[in-house]
């Protein structure tokens, strides 16, 4: 009888577990990142790719960098121009790109002063042509918060980032291209083996400011 009673007790307890779990309050949703005032800051960055394993045509490198900029949330209208191209078509030994792109940056007093000073040089030309005041445009502020952008290679065969892009991503980090554009690399794991493609070679995370949509 004692053994039977213990079994019933265990069964009753197990049956109650789903009810107890359901009664537990749900974990609170994580707080959104703090909102800051931001401005668009345009920067120009030159980059030359030096391959050992994966080779790109000039168009291929340009398109890959364009995709990265879109992932980072660069302001529409950015440009990526090919540099140092010799081959009309096919892989290049050391293709390069010139990037002109704007990403949000926190609107500190120092940055606003710098942007206003740079834009003031264009004021006379803007007035003569009836264009908007460049100082007002350059210092226009908007709310933004930090967004984490993750890059992971080879998730599917159709992924934009493949394991063969390992050297490219590694060189972009090493050359501080992300930093020069106004992004922050917070996690960088690349396993690039010369003349060999490694599965799962790229796992990176980059933080950028993202405009907060108007309510």
Region locations from a protein language model:
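Sec/Tat-exported extracytoplasmic proteins
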Residues: 68-76, 176-181
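Bacterial N-terminal signal peptides that target proteins for export
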Residues: 1-13
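Acidic/histidine-rich, surface-exposed loop or edge segments in extracytoplasmic proteins
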Residues: 36-53, 141-160
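Glycine-rich, aromatic-bearing surface loops/beta-hairpins
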Residues: 152-163, 167-215
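Acidic helix-start/capping segments at beta-turn-to-alpha-helix junctions
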Residues: 77-102, 190-197
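Extracytoplasmic/secreted envelope proteins and their assembly/folding machinery
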Residues: 58, 62, 66-69, 170, ...
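Boundary at the C-terminal end of the N-terminal hydrophobic targeting segment
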Residues: 21-25
């Amino acid at each position: 009888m004692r053994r039977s009673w213990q079994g019933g007790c265990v069964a009753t307890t197990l049956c109650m577990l789903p009810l107890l779990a359901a009664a537990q309050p749900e974990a609170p949703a994580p707080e959104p990142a703090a909102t800051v005032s931001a401005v668009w800051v345009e920067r120009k960055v030159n980059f030359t790719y030096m391959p050992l394993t994966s080779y790109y045509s000039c168009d291929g490198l340009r398109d890959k960098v364009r995709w990265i900029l879109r992932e980072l949330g660069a302001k529409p209208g950015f440009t990526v121009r090919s540099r140092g191209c010799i081959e009309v078509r096919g892989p290049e030994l050391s293709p390069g790109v010139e990037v002109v792109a704007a990403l949000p940056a926190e609107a500190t007093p120092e940055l606003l002063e710098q942007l206003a000073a740079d834009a003031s040089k264009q004021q006379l030309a803007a007035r003569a042509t009836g264009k908007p005041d460049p100082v007002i445009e350059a210092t226009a502020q908007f709310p933004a918060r930090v967004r984490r952008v993750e890059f992971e290679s080879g998730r599917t065969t159709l992924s934009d980032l493949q394991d063969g892009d390992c050297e490219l991503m590694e060189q972009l980090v090493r050359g501080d291209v992300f930093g020069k554009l106004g992004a922050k690399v917070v996690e960088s794991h690349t396993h690039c083996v010369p003349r060999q493609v490694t599965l799962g070679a790229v796992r990176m995370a980059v933080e950028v400011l993202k405009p907060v949509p108007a309510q």
